[in-house]
Amino acid sequence: MPREDRATWKSNYFLKIIQLLDDYPKCFIVGADNVGSKQMQQIRMSLRGKAVVLMGKNTMMRKAIRGHLENNPALEKLLPHIRGNVGFVFTKEDLTEIRDMLLANKVPAAARAGAIAPCEVTVPAQNTGLGPEKTSFFQALGITTKISRGTIEILSDVQLIKTGDKVGASEATLLNMLNISPFSFGLIIQQVFDNGSIYNPEVLDITEETLHSRFLEGVRNVASVCLQIGYPTVASVPHSIINGYKRVLALSVETDYTFPLAEKVKAFLADPSAFVAAAPVAAATTAAPAAAAAAPAKVEAKEESEESDEDMGFGLFD
């Protein structure tokens, strides 16, 4: 009977993962190291209605996917990434939104001796509140301290652990004494599968503004190269026309050859003061009609005011 139950469970698991792969066009491959059952339950509850979390043995997941390759060959891209303690998060929602929800469900964790540090750990300068008898402990870790009012004070920030280092017993003890929980554990996105394409989760950080700026940077680079080698393209032609016009204008200024636009430049170079004097005159000419138009309006307003006073029976000498 137990064998039948096990076989039935396996069959149901295969059907479930195949159904999820068919129903959901997008999923994350997530690492679940150091994630406990209680935290996993909280993650499932927070994603309810938006995503489905599926964990299982790697061999079973690979077997289920291989058996479904005839119907969906794109799933073969998932196989190389199913290694270690991993699972799937299936969704139809925006991937960035689900990623943010997974990050929000990380929980702080204390450092344990022998664990691999997922991030860098720095102990800030502070008064530890520990007694002088612990001084030798800090000295063994190479941390500069002094005694201040009967307690140990760390004088400067200290990088205690680097990313990927194994946490030593002394480092773990120190962090626990200082009540520092340097790590946070949760489901870590390792790969993104989206409608048959698989890519790094860093792609989710690319915004429309990033794409726009990268595109403009590429256009500028293309225009620069084309200008240097004299090869006309859509990006470089406007600059080529402007540069050509500047050269023709410079040639016209230095020679007797002229054309309408060059005549204005020549006139300016011949007598710049004329253009300086013309600017205030032009401004005054523009302002005069406006003032003239405003004056009749004020007179009309005054006449209307006087007429209204007479109509109301409040003349000046009544």
UniProtKB/Swiss-Prot annotation:
Locations listed in the record: Nucleus; Cytoplasm
Superkingdom is: Eukaryota
Q: Which residues carry this modification: Phosphoserine?
A: 305, 308
Q: Which residues cross the membrane?
A: none
List of residues that carry Phosphothreonine: 59
The record's section on SUPFAM superfamilies has: Ribosomal protein L10-like (SSF160369)
Give residues for the crosslink Glycyl lysine isopeptide (Lys-Gly) (interchain with G-Cter in ubiquitin).
264
Q: Cite the record's Acidic residues compositional bias ranges.
A: 303-312
Q: What family is it from?
A: Belongs to the universal ribosomal protein uL10 family.
Description of how the protein assembles with itself and partners: P0 forms a pentameric complex by interaction with dimers of P1 and P2. Identified in a IGF2BP1-dependent mRNP granule complex containing untranslated mRNAs. Interacts with APEX1. Interacts with FMR1.
Q: What is this protein called?
A: Large ribosomal subunit protein uL10
User: Organism source for this protein?
Assistant: Sus scrofa (Pig)
